[in-house]
Amino acid sequence: MHSDITPIHTHKKYWAECFGTAPFLPTSRKEMDALGWDSCDIVLVTGDAYVDHPSFGMAIIGRLLEAQGFRVGIIAQPQWQDKTDFMSLGKPNLFFGVTSGNMDSMINRYTSDRKLRHDDAYTPNNEGGKRPDRATLVYSQRCREAYKDVPIVLGGIEASLRRVAHYDYWSDKVRRSVLLDAKADILLFGNAERALVEVAHRLAEGEEIAQMTNIRGTAVNLAAEPEGYTIIDSSRIEKPRKEAFIPPNPYEVETQCETKSEEPKAQPITIRPSRHDAATTAVRLPSFEKLQNDRILYAHASRILHLETNPYSGRALIQRHGNRELWVNQAPIPLTTEEMDYVFGLPYARVPHPKYGKAKIPAYDMIKTSVNIMRGCFGGCSFCSITEHEGRIIQNRSQESILTELEEIRDKVPGFTGTISDLGGPTANMYRLGCSDPKAEANCRRPSCVFPGICNKLNTDHKHTIDLYRAARQVKGVKKVMIASGVRYDLAIESPEYVKELVTHHVGGYLKIAPEHTEKGPLDLMMKPGMGTYDRFKEMFDKYSQEAGKKQYLIPYFISAHPGTTDEDMLNLALWLKKNNYECDQVQNFYPSPMCNATSMYYSETNPLKRVKYKQREDVPVAKGDRQRRLHKALLRYHDPANWPLIREALITMGKKYLIGDKPGCLVPAEDVDARTPAQRRKSGRHGANRFATKHTSTQPGFPGDKANAGSGKKPTRGGQSNSAPSRSGSATGGKHPQRSGANTGGKSSGGKNSPRAGGRNQPSRAR
């Protein structure tokens, strides 16, 4: 399939390869002089500190371009108030590569309540304020001021998820594509190594960047529609233009793939290819101007966008912005295993740049002994952008490449103790899983391979993952291999052998999984499995933990205020937590990040997962007001006395006054309990048995297994990574993982970072 694609490691190298490999990519003129360079071919500008590690975007992109023969310099966290820092490496011969960093700068700087954060895990000493709001725009402006005639290439998570007109939570309005606002020359979206290498070589050959309009995984700003394309008009919901040819609408088909939960009599999947060649067809989205004032049309546009993400059958998109046309090419072809091995096998130093001295960079400390084994996610959770950024098709590394990296960690990472903190990716257990039918995979438009049930064509055999775990444990010098990426438990229960292997050898006391909610309404809109699946996994987890002679615990993640969640839903979740003796130390309030389906629900109050019409649509209840969002968060922390007055008021309003009091079935005590001291409340049994944190600190508070594990020599490990950990998969000029919409940490901590992962988070890695 697509045999005409040139592997990224087979391009003819640029002449400057004669300079060899730099110990670190230069960040100053002095370092350039030491390498014998008179100039840089490419200068990368990033909002993160420069850590030469494959979990950091600039390192992957910089080392990849260096391997192609280019001289690459890095300007990390420049002073953006003027152009001085942007001229520190001189004028690049080819282009500036600009990214906000591993995270969207707005998510990095603000909480879900739009409060300014005072820390930054990607900055030395966790110092906040080292990058501007909308860093991609600001950096692009300064690059243009520094050298007006140098092309600007945008990439990373911020640019990728803002490539079309999008709802912006912080300004509460629809904004233009970041490409037009930044006035850059081209935007690369997703894990764009393939596109970036092509752009670099074509520029090196003397081609004008304005001529590069047909590269997969890119978006460009055009004056008019390109010639040679059939344009399908989806700019309206019910009244398309009469002059446009309207083929049978592929978005009207509501049939689902056969799932494993269905009866055997279910009909098999029927492949119905489009009557148009995807390579010469484009879909017109509603214009930016229309989306500004029409929320229902925005939901329609979001639906179309998400249905065109398949790299094999998805079509180009075109969207009017004033008198300009935004042209978004087809999604990039996924990297092969050989290409993935090439990217992760580049000569990374695996430590921060020496200029930072002894300063601690929290994001690096979190992932310095972890290994990314794959990219992509076919979970399709509506609050997560991984599919839109990394793709639904899993891109795997070979076992040999992964084991080699384990040996590099052993040999290169200072202070390595023998523990590998994670083998994972967006999820822990999608390694080498995927569609068993290439034809179906090439034409499928399902947003998820596992919802509402696991597709019969999905290979769920975890054999390769089990073999990898066993091989990793045999690497000399490796004493323990932990799995910190979130486990997709609906997949795991399809392979009991995997669950046994995981629980027996790779859980350090706690394992984080993400049911996200207990109620069917929110779960369906999240595209998450029901609690019955969670219960089955918990039974297996407890069974195998007991067989292994270990006391281990599941830590469930939940989201408050997700679109589709009513006060009644959150109350039922709180009652479930109390019934199961769970007390969330910190909670997650839904965070509408760009391009997520859930963000479209939040803005439009309409379900974009189904066909959208003005008079025929599914409306979605949304918690938008500050008070209701506080209430939903408070219900997740029902045990916190500070939340009791708000919960009491809500219970009375809902006609649930019987849940106030000291009876076993009550959620919060009567008002007279407020005057008691914390010690008195603990003595009265107001606190549940299982108190847990959803954002890890250096210790895990209050879980009953701590003493048992300590006594047996088994240290509880991070069952999931901190919300401030970096993501771990490559994308053009940085930004390694899409952030989750629902990943803001709340509770007592106001400074918790949003994860770029789904898991992981990543986007920390959190299974979605």
Swiss-Prot record:
Ranges for region Disordered: 674-768
Keywords in alphabetical order: 4Fe-4S, Iron, Iron-sulfur, Metal-binding, S-adenosyl-L-methionine
Any GO molecular function: iron ion binding
Bias (Polar residues) ranges: 719-731
Chain sites annotated for binding [4Fe-4S] cluster: C377, C381, C384
Domain Radical SAM core: 363-640
Disulfide bridge map: none
InterPro entries given in the database record: Elp3/MiaA/NifB-like_rSAM (IPR006638), Methylthiotransferase_CS (IPR020612), rSAM (IPR007197), rSAM_horseshoe (IPR023404), UPF0313 (IPR022946), UPF0313_C (IPR024560), UPF0313_N (IPR013704)
Skewed-composition ranges (Basic residues): 679-689
Coiled coil: none
Keyword 4Fe-4S: yes
PROSITE patterns, sorted: RADICAL_SAM
Note on how the cofactor is bound: Binds 1 [4Fe-4S] cluster. The cluster is coordinated with 3 cysteines and an exchangeable S-adenosyl-L-methionine.
Cofactor(s) this protein cannot do without: [4Fe-4S] cluster
HAMAP family membership: UPF0313 (MF_01251)
Family, per entry: Belongs to the UPF0313 family.
Identification of the protein by name: UPF0313 protein VV2143
Lineage: Bacteria, Pseudomonadati, Pseudomonadota, Gammaproteobacteria, Vibrionales
